[in-house]
Structure formats: structure tokens, C-alpha cells
Amino acid sequence: MADKKGSNSEKLLYCSFCGKSQHEVKKLIAGPSVFICDECIDLCNEIIRDEAAGAGIEAGLSKSDLPSPQEIREILDQYVIGQERAKKILAVAVYNHYKRLKHLDKKDEIELSKSNILLIGPTGSGKTLLAQTLARLLNVPFVIADATTLTEAGYVGEDVENIIQKLLQNCNYEVDKAQRGIVYIDEIDKISRKSDNPSITRDVSGEGVQQALLKLVEGTMASVPPQGGRKHPNQDFIQVDTTNILFICGGAFDGLEKVIVDRTEKTGIGFGASVKSKQDRDAGEVLREVEPEDLIKFGLIPELIGRLPVVATLGKLDEVALMKILVEPKNALVKQYHKLFNMERVELEIRPAALQAVARKAIRRKTGARGLRSILEQALLDVMYDLPQMKGVSKVIIDDNVIDGDGKPLLIYEDAPKVAGSN
């Protein structure tokens, strides 16, 4: 029944799907003899989105209009500011990878190898965001793994096959989808071996993990326990072929510039050699000259470097880039805070001087773009705490004094004269 009589003979309308009355929901939409509430509509939309996303993984990889490198780059531009060369390298590498997957079934004498990617750049330069954006664009399963938590199988900690288990969880244990996903391994530089000579002692979280990752990255049948289970000998495992999973490894590689400079300066000796002091060279400029031998000297094993043929370096973000990151991307932080304040029916204005102060603070902290949110959150904490209880506030203005901790936000009230707070 879509309608019932109330105790006071008022005709109450009910949702035909969940049975809630018109007083229990925000909106009740009528059809021929049926009603549906806003909550059921939201639930239906969620179900449709989930099913479309699942179907889209196969569709996205089999249809002829796979995004071109230029289109991939344009979408990356909407979310990631700067790092132009890295975006170009990634766009080409990802396009070639999924183009290769589309032609796997075709018989051909030439077998195309997989090109995994290594991202090198300082903290907060956009490595993780680039990988996340690519996965969202291609609509494929995606997982982020932290290399510092990994240990060799048999030791306390996560073994490398846990990465594949997380990937399976992200696509509801559908093996075919997982086998075409993207894995981002962060902090890969933290598992470098302690010296560039092969170790004779057991290094369970360094060279040992690199050896374990090597098999996964180049392609192997990973044995993963069933949904929600833990590994034990007397159980059936899910077999996942990692051959077509795209692995993107990222790390800050602190100290790699010194290794590169030491190598390049050795070759720049004698008359006519270009002499440039270490201080004159930007770290990003130095990193662009990275060679496999530098990564080996840093502590990565040669076999793993060979499985990461595409190397993209990201530079340190300057003040201008950080200010752009605050306002320009689709999901920019300032846009997010505008939306939060709009929910309270209050306009938020963050002045250019305040944006500059946020950027400078992030540079001083050496946190890059990753530190921007915590700086803004700290500056806006008090006003976000008080605002729901305050009456008549129409606008909040943030200037550089608020960011630096020397002042409080300027509040404009609805009944205040127009000149209040202006200048």
C-alpha cells in the first residue's frame, strides 16, 4: 500500500519500496499508484553506479576509443599542477600498456613487453596523486601499498602477495578485473639495500623485499587466500596472474642527487669542461639525469631496475605552483573548503596573501602539496568549531595574519553595513 489513513483521518503517503511515511523522508515522488522516497532513489543510483563501474573496466579496455596520450595528459592537468614532463611520460606509458592489453588475444610474432613505471620526486610533489588519477581515468582497480611495511615471506610483517589481496578486495575478488589493475608501491626507496655490494646477511625488509617484489612486478602467479581468509597450508588459494598488472613505484630517493652529481662531475674534468657548482643546480634538474647505475649505487637491485624501464622525475614545487594547487585543480582544497562553508550558508573568502602564506609555510615545513591541507585546517579550526552555533554570519574572510597565527578570521554579519570588513 502506498497510502494509509492516519489517526486524524489525514491521508498519509508511504514509499512503495521501503515503507517510510512522507514525514520520515525529505521527498516523496509520485508515480502511477506508487511512490518512491529520496533515500531509495539514492540507493538505486548507488547500485547503478557500482554496476556501471564494474562493467566499465572491461568496456574501457576493449573499446576502440582508449584515451590518447594527449587526452590522458589533459585529464591529469585537471588534477595535478606542474610536473609537465612526468605527466607526458606517464600518459605515453599508460596508453601503451593498455593498448598492449587490447591486442593480447591477437596472434603475432612480436610479443610486447610490459613497461612498469618508476616515479622519483620529493615528498608532496604529486606522485601518488598522478597514479590515483590514472586509475580513476581508466576505471581499473587500484591499490596503494607502502613498501616500508613489507617483509620477506615467513617474517613478521606483510609479504608482497598481500598487495594483490588488497587489489582483489578493491574489485570484489573478481580475478579478471584485478589482473588488469594498477598497483602503486610507495616509498620504494626505503627498501634499498644498505650498500651497493650484495649482502651476505639476511635483510628481510630491504634487498629481500626487492627480490620478492621482482617476481610480482615481472609477472607471476600469486597465491592469495580466499575472501577474508589468512594463509594456512590446508586451503585453496586464488591464483592471480600479475603479468598484465601495471606497477608504478614511487619514492623520494633522498640523496640520489648527490650520487648523480658525483658521477657527472667525474666526467666533467679538464679544459673546456662545463663547471657548475652543486649549489647552482636545481635538484629536479639533477634528477632528470638519473641513470640505472645511480639507482644501483643508491641501493636498488639491478634486476628490479630492469623491470621498471619507464622513469619519470618530479621536481620540487615552488611557491607559485603550490598557490595554483590550492585553487586550480578540479578538487582544489580551497574549493573543498568553500563547499564546506556553503553548507553552513556562509561564504568563505581566502585572500591571495593568505594563499601565499600557506604556500610559504608548506615550503618551510618541506611537506610540498601534502602539507597544504593541515595548514588550512589549523587556520580554519576555530571558526569551523564556532560557526554552527553563531547566528547571522554571512561571510568569513581569511588573510595572511590568520595563516601565520597572528590574527583571527574576519566575520561579516548579514545585518552589518556594506562597508564592514571592506578593504
UniProtKB/Swiss-Prot annotation:
SMART domains hit by this protein: AAA, ClpB_D2-small, zf-C4_ClpX
CDD domains: RecA-like_ClpX
Keyword terms: ATP-binding, Chaperone, Metal-binding, Nucleotide-binding, Zinc
Residues of the ClpX-type ZB domain: 3-56
Entry annotated with the keyword Magnesium: no
A Pfam short name: AAA_2
GO terms of biological process kind: cell division; proteolysis involved in protein catabolic process
Annotated positions binding ATP: P122, T123, G124, S125, G126, K127, T128, L129
GO molecular function term, any single one: ATP hydrolysis activity
InterPro entries linked to this entry: AAA+_ATPase, ATP-dep_Clp_protease_ClpX, ATPase_AAA_core, Clp_ATPase_C, Clp_protease_ATP-bd_su_ClpX, ClpX_bact, P-loop_NTPase, Znf_CppX_C4
Residues that hold Zn(2+) according to the record: C15, C18, C37, C40
Cellular component annotations (GO), alphabetically ordered: HslUV protease complex
Domain of life: Bacteria
HAMAP family assigned to the protein according to its UniProt record, in alphabetical order: ClpX
Complexes and interactors: Component of the ClpX-ClpP complex. Forms a hexameric ring that, in the presence of ATP, binds to fourteen ClpP subunits assembled into a disk-like structure with a central cavity, resembling the structure of eukaryotic proteasomes.
Protein family per UniProt: Belongs to the ClpX chaperone family.
Protein task: ATP-dependent specificity component of the Clp protease. It directs the protease to specific substrates. Can perform chaperone functions in the absence of ClpP.
Protein name from the UniProt record: ATP-dependent Clp protease ATP-binding subunit ClpX
Organism whose genome encodes this protein: Paraburkholderia phytofirmans (strain DSM 17436 / LMG 22146 / PsJN)
Gene: clpX
